[in-house]
Amino acid sequence: MKDKFELVSKYSPQGDQPRAIEQLVAGLKKGLKHQTLLGATGTGKTFTVSNVIQEVNKPTLVMAHNKTLAGQLYSEFKEFFPNNAVEYFVSYYDYYQPEAYVPQSDTYIEKDASINDEIDKLRHSATAALFERRDVIIIASVSCIYGLGSPVEYGEMLVSLRVGMEISRDQLLRKLVDIQYDRNDIDFQRGRFRVRGDVVEIFPASRDEHCMRIEFFGDEIERIREVDALTGEIIGDREHVSIFPASHFVTRPDIMKKAIVNIKAELEDRLKVLRAENKLLEAQRLEQRTNYDIEMMEEMGYCSGIENYSRHLSLRPAGVTPYTLLDYFPDDFQIVIDESHVTMPQIRGMFNGDQARKQMLVDHGFRLPSALDNRPLRLEEFEKHINQIMFISATPGPYELEKNPDVIEQIIRPTGLLDPIVEIRPIQGQIDDLMDEINDRVEKNERVLITTLTKKMSEDLTNYLKEAGVKVQYLHSEVKTLERIEIIRDLRLGVYDVIVGINLLREGIDLPEVSLVAILDADKEGFLRSERSLIQTMGRAARNENGRVIMYADKMTDSMRNSISETERRRKIQIEYNEKHGITPKTIRKEIRGIIAATSAADEREAIKQHDLSKMSKKERDIFIEGMEHEMKEAAKALDFERAAELRDALLEIKAEG
């Protein structure tokens, strides 16, 4: 079992980083439960945390408040720890409409979701890694505090295979069906197996390229091979392989029988209550739906919405804390909360929203009361899972400061870059003034972020700038995660010079090309113009040597005064450090890269151009083309015709080139 973290970087800690690393490590070794790193934007907080992880050498959960930020962190940690298990665990829904009931209009809304297969694979990879090794960093969104199947069941149900092991082919097939693998000899993909005589090929749920070929001689495993699932090329021989379940809600047949008995008993009790209250329609509905689910579980081992029975499937009493990803970690793991001033309030609020919706379903006979136990953790339950935790933020919130008021500061940037200069200008004539500033930045090949207070103002401003010939895009809450990453990436590439948004430009977006942040209506007090929000927004201009913030306001609010004062305090410390060490601030141009396959915004043709086909052998070229053709067919099958057409055109170009 590999258990040592190995940080790979051409950089060594600079500026404030060595002191911050030393203090955090000392605190962890001393047994401090809560620590807070106040790290200004662009000071290399991820690098600092990476050094701490290497030094302390414990499995680590890094939590972010949205998929975009989690994707960026995943990419960065993957670069720092190429030889360790860096995993990604976020909600696997591209689209999610939760089950709900609106009594006023008697409207039942069925659960509707689109699952992202790539993210599902990464989730399985994350939990499998925790069973196989200790050098694991999992980057997760707050969805990791939602209910997951029992880690005990998950671990006990894994199928462990060794060369020389006595097991018949049919016994193996039954075991695979028990852990929710499907047999499919034609359409072979993740979570499936196929059989050819004495050879069984298994496609693990945590992989998307390599499968395992198990060769039998009688009732004994003669050979285990790792094989490229697409080409059939042998990757290598294996002495041992663990096949993890294809679902996190997997249950042993004996436990399933007990669970069904308990579900039937709960149904009987609930029907008595509903009939006593003269809710006959609700009783009939609940009986019909639950009996259908029970039949499915008896026949297939699972049903749609099986997570609503998770309490019974793990044989837990009512009200007990549900299993989550946190239960899959060993006891000595550590948690890092990124952008904690946003993430902690999210953790606090998730339980209440979930319960309000589910209670309505229970009251009207759509679900049994036990469905209420398939839920996210309460804050106090989350706190019980904490062994040691580090809060990371440029603006720590009240929760973090209450837990440990001794904040560790990281103000100096290794690049020598300073916090931006802040100017206040009158609201009168702000758009004309802004146009001049945009034109000035465009000439220098720099980018601009503009933050407004309302959707209407964002739309109007975007349209006005477009008519004036500015390459501008509006980033709003209805933009999907993948499109959002694409827009941010396009800003860096110069497809756009300006992005207009409301509350979407603050935390953790790394944009060194941005030299101007314009804050409209800066004097309108509220959560979008609070001291913490303003400091975060200003920080978007701190990665460029020409960074500047313009606040358009007619009066000075306390939030403006405090945020400007804090920025000036940091700027003073940074200038003194630079003068003492002879550092000249210089913008660091980071490589513009995709984040993960599931959230990459790269254009297909650009991606294909990166493969120098002229240097490939005929066999390599044929394999590459075959892979693209497979991808094109999969895209068409998924009704993603635009992507399929792009791949088709690229294939035609490649074939035309000979």
Swiss-Prot record:
Full protein name: UvrABC system protein B
Every Helicase C-terminal domain range: 430-592
One Pfam family cited in the UniProt record for this chain: UVR
Location of the protein in the cell: Cytoplasm
Cross-referenced HAMAP family: UvrB
Recorded GO CC terms: cytoplasm; excinuclease repair complex
Matching PROSITE patterns: HELICASE_ATP_BIND_1 (PS51192), HELICASE_CTER (PS51194), UVR (PS50151)
Organism annotation: Listeria innocua serovar 6a (strain ATCC BAA-680 / CLIP 11262)
UniProt keyword list: ATP-binding, Cytoplasm, DNA damage, DNA excision, DNA repair, Excision nuclease, Nucleotide-binding, SOS response
